[in-house]
Amino acid sequence: MACIRRITILLNCNQMDNLLCVINNILALKFSSSVQVSGSVLVCDSIDQVGIDSMKRAGLTVHYKPDIKPAELVSSVKDYDVLVVRSRTKVTKEVVDAAVQAKIIARVGVGLDNVDVQAAEMKKIRVINAPEAASIAVSELVIGLMISLARSIPKADAETKRGNWIKKDLMGTQLSGKYLGIVGVGNIGRNIGRMAKALRMNLIGYDPYPINREFISETGMIVTDLNTLLESADFVTCHVPATPETKHMFNSERLARMKSTAYLINTSRGDVIDENALFEVLKSGKLAGAALDVFEVEPPTNKELMNLANVVCTPHIGAQTKEAQELASRVIAEKVIQILRGVI
């Protein structure tokens, strides 16, 4: 108490109000963290154990069914307050309608394109995700894919293992000094930008929403429209959600604007690129190469595109690191618990 009195003397009224607000928030958070919650959780996909353990410690009953089939999900979802999914499970309107007691649909990851958000909102079901968890993992993959394209690493590896010493055929290009165009400068886009700056790349950015001013100042990013970005960049990486506005954002017209020496990287959502249009510009040499971690159909069926020598493919592994999956599971569990406690 003596300490609080001394602090009070030094503070004006506004400062005291702010201090009391902080103290009250800390006390409320401390109190809420010890409050047990009740409810049942259905985990429909494989997630890290840390999140399951957190929900159980909070008092929730957790049923873990990572291989649940659509028909079983529809018939059993009525018994649960919380539905936890990754990308495999499709939370359709049929599933939402059957979830008669659901309060939360939680996506352990970034995108929500496998959840009928509109149907959930109509039923007053909270839809949450963990976009912050995968940021570093996705960003590192993008850098890896850029280097793979620039130095033909997949081809170099495959030919060397076959006993073919094709050193003279593998003339690459450096990332240093090149222009990286970032389409969608959100959390992931900014992380990639910082990593690219460490490689001495120059940044060009496009986003329909305002880009963080501090980030622009920190990195020297040139902010421009999409067409100018495509015409100027040596590498283009895409980080936008799947929406009607972004479907086939990279169509024939926009792909034709890119330099013939440029590379396109997509780790966001498959349908932002028209794969048939991409195949044509890559096959004709109007685009140097592409790296794809996501596809219009997954697993992908466009074998012609995948088998091109100037295409690097990965099976949607952007967030597939131990650290990212552990963090996503932890973040989602904490959000679920705090919502049920009424804290958020």
Whereabouts are the PLM-identified features?
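N-terminal Rossmann-fold cofactor-binding loop
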Residues: 45, 66-67, 207-209, 268
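N-terminal Rossmann-fold NAD(P) dinucleotide-binding loop
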Residues: 189-190
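C-terminal helix-to-coil terminal segments
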Residues: 4, 13-15, 21-34, 121, ...
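Glycine-rich Rossmann-fold phosphate-binding loop(s) that bind the pyrophosphate
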Residues: 185-186
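Rossmann-like adenosine-cofactor binding region
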Residues: 89-96, 208-304, 320
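An N-terminal-biased, well-structured beta-alpha scaffold segment characteristic
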Residues: 5, 19-128, 231, 251-257
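Phosphate-binding beta-alpha-beta segment of Rossmann-like dinucleotide-binding domains, i.e.
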Residues: 123, 131-179, 194, 198, ...
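Short, Asp-centered acidic motifs that coordinate Mg2+ and/or phosphate
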Residues: 81-82, 104, 235, 263, ...
